[in-house]
């Protein structure tokens, strides 16, 4: 079966040129359409496949984020703005579609697979990513491949910071599974894939923000993972919600690249909260006292980029 792969472009030369138009509520988003395909539904596990060297503290940054998305844990997150509140924009796509089924989407942290021995080497192709993703469970799951800072990936830093797509399942004929890949850009291209925690390669050179978890690479990965999670939920197989050509669409997260808070403009992420102790900038809170900076998502009901405050 032919597979679908969509790279998540976070090249800020493009983002800076487009940001003003994307944050303008008068912008015409009528081409942001539902293309009659499936959305993710049901109880879905997020399996994490760690490729390369990650410290336990680094893995915890991501696992706490994924766990914060879980609907079963939302009652423990009374403080707003929260990761769960941010995810509610994704839920609007299900309401907007007027789904006939009562099944929505419930996410939970699934299994974790550690590949610290670089079983496929330190230079990966798209096929390698799919093979790694296939190691996770394929039933009601999204398999997330996370590559460490010393691993190069085809297209990484040149035209993408991560991607989502589908692979052929190992079950019945015609089955397929969704996967995500995100790379740690800290030593390779932080100005492209970890802004605003690093000065951008192009555009206005405002001082970088302090990463909320004191890890430019991992906090940048969370930004990209969050956007790709939203895209995977609303366009898992390439025929869900998106704007523009199918080969290079704008999706729920990528339609709002570079927007994190109200008042954003090229070189400025927008109005954010700042931790009084660490100086880290953030816009949501998660489990275990975590704070994250998450991207604005495209709101299908208001036809605009939705920020939390």
Curated annotation (Swiss-Prot):
**Which Pfam families is this protein grouped with?**
Phi_1
Subcellular localization: Secreted; Secreted, Extracellular space; Secreted, Extracellular space, Apoplast
Keyword list, A-Z? Apoplast, Secreted, Signal
Please state what is observed when this gene is inactivated.
No visible phenotype under normal growth conditions, but mutant plants show diminished biomass production under low carbon and energy conditions.
Q: Does the keyword Mitochondrion apply?
A: no
Which InterPro entries is this protein grouped with? EXORDIUM-like
Chief location bin: secreted
The induction comment states:
By brassinolide.
Query: Which cysteines are cross-linked by disulfides?
Result: none
Q: Which GO terms describe its cellular component?
A: apoplast; Golgi apparatus; plant-type cell wall
Residues folding into a coiled coil are: none
Q: Where is the signal peptide?
A: 1-23
**For this chain's UniProt record, which GO biological process terms are given?**
cellular response to hypoxia; response to hypoxia
Family listed = Belongs to the EXORDIUM family.
Known role: May play a role in a brassinosteroid-dependent regulatory pathway that controls growth and development under low carbon and energy availability.
Protein name stated in the entry: Protein EXORDIUM-like 1
Q: Which organism is it from?
A: Arabidopsis thaliana (Mouse-ear cress)
């Amino acid at each position: 079966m032919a597979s679908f792969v969509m790279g998540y472009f976070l090249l800020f030369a493009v983002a800076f040129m487009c940001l003003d138009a994307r944050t303008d509520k008068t912008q015409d988003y009528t081409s942001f359409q539902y293309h009659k395909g499936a959305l993710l539904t049901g109880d879905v596990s997020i399996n994490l496949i760690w490729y390369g060297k990650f410290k336990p503290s680094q893995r915890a940054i991501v696992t706490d984020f994924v766990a914060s998305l879980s609907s079963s844990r939302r009652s423990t997150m009374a403080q707003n703005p929260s990761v769960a509140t941010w995810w509610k924009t994704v839920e609007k796509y299900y309401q907007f579609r007027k789904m006939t089924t009562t099944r929505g989407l419930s996410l939970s942290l699934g299994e974790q697979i550690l590949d610290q021995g670089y079983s496929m080497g330190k230079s990966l192709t798209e096929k390698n990513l799919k093979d790694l993703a296939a190691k996770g469970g394929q039933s009601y799951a999204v398999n997330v491949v996370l590559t460490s800072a010393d691993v190069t990936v085809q297209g990484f830093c040149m035209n993408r910071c991560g991607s989502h797509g589908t692979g052929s399942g190992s079950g019945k004929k015609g089955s397929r599974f969704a996967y995500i890949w995100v790379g740690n850009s800290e030593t390779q291209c932080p100005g492209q894939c970890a802004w605003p925690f690093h000065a951008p390669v192009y555009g206005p050179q405002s001082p970088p923000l302090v990463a909320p978890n004191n890890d430019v690479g991992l906090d940048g990965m969370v930004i990209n993972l969050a956007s790709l999670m939203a895209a995977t939920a609303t366009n898992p197989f390439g025929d869900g919600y998106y704007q523009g050509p199918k080969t290079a669409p704008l999706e729920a997260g990528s339609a709002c690249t570079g927007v994190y808070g109200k008042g954003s403009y090229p070189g400025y992420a927008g109005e954010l909260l700042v931790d009084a102790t660490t100086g880290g900038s953030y816009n949501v809170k998660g489990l275990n006292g975590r704070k994250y900076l998450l991207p604005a998502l495209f709101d299908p009901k208001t036809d605009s980029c939705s920020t939390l405050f």
